[in-house]
């Protein structure tokens, strides 16, 4: 088992299981929240750039 920082006691199996469960929950949170938010921001940026350039093209044609 791993040595806990600043403590003489080593990590127990129960502590290891709880730590792994917390890591798994954190990973699931990233997958379900952070990635879709980043994707939405990226899509909005692309839509903004496309709309800004298409407006500019209309003026250039006249």
Swiss-Prot record:
Q: Which domain of life is it from?
A: Eukaryota
One GO cellular component term, please give it: membrane
Q: Is Membrane found in the keyword set?
A: yes
Transmembrane region(s): 30-50
Q: Where is this region: Disordered?
A: 1-27
Tell where it localizes: Membrane
Q: Is Membrane one of the keywords?
A: yes
Q: Which residues form a coiled coil?
A: 9-31
Name of the protein in question: Single-pass membrane and coiled-coil domain-containing protein 4 homolog
InterPro entries linked to this entry: DUF4519 (IPR027960)
Keywords for this protein: Coiled coil, Membrane, Transmembrane, Transmembrane helix
Where is this chain primarily localised? Answer: membrane
Q: Which family does it belong to?
A: Belongs to the SMCO4 family.
- A Pfam match: DUF4519
Its lineage reads: Eukaryota, Metazoa, Cnidaria, Anthozoa, Hexacorallia
Q: How does it sit in the membrane?
A: Single-pass membrane protein
């Amino acid at each position: 088992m791993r040595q806990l920082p600043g403590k003489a006691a080593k990590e127990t199996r129960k502590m290891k299981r709880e730590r792994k469960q917390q890591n798994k929950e954190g990973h699931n949170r990233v997958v379900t929240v952070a990635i879709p938010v980043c994707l939405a921001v990226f899509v909005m940026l692309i839509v903004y750039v496309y709309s800004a350039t298409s407006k500019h093209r209309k003026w250039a044609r006249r």
